[in-house]
């Protein structure tokens, strides 16, 4: 079975002297759509902040740290992996937001062909 997803991660990133990039996870929002739906106007989704592992909504297979391997360009101009190493706390301020919409779980070449996900007028509410 295949399904689309909406994912938002808030991270606080830093770079060491060797150009390695690290991040704390400050906020997490992961929504999978397990069934076909009609068009939804003004849909909103909660961002969970800090260490969410004890929350009832937490699902480790889709919300754990380093759930996917993501890359960034460091200060040396090199493409390097982002090492998500810890959960943030109430004192951490995010430096980066990762927002992903995918029509097929697992990305290209893994999901089912023919899936469609329409996204229109995305906005942040804070």
Regions found by a protein language model. Give the residues of each.
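One-face residue pattern on beta-strands with alternating periodicity enriched for small/polar residues
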Residues: 5-9, 42-46, 98-100
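Short, surface-exposed beta-strand/loop "edge" segments at domain boundaries and coil↔beta transitions
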Residues: 15-24, 105-112
């Amino acid at each position: 079975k295949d399904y689309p997803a909406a994912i938002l991660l808030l991270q606080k990133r830093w770079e060491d002297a060797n150009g390695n990039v690290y991040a704390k996870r400050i906020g997490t929002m992961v929504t999978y759509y397990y069934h076909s739906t009609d068009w939804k106007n003004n849909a909103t989704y909660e961002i969970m902040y800090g260490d969410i592992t004890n929350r009832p909504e937490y699902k480790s297979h889709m919300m754990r740290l380093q759930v996917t391997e993501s890359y960034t360009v460091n200060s040396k101009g090199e493409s390097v992996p982002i090492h998500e190493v810890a959960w943030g706390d109430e004192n951490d301020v995010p430096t980066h937001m990762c927002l992903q919409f995918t029509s097929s779980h697992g990305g290209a070449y893994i999901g089912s062909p023919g899936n469609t996900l329409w996204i229109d007028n995305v906005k942040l509410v804070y």
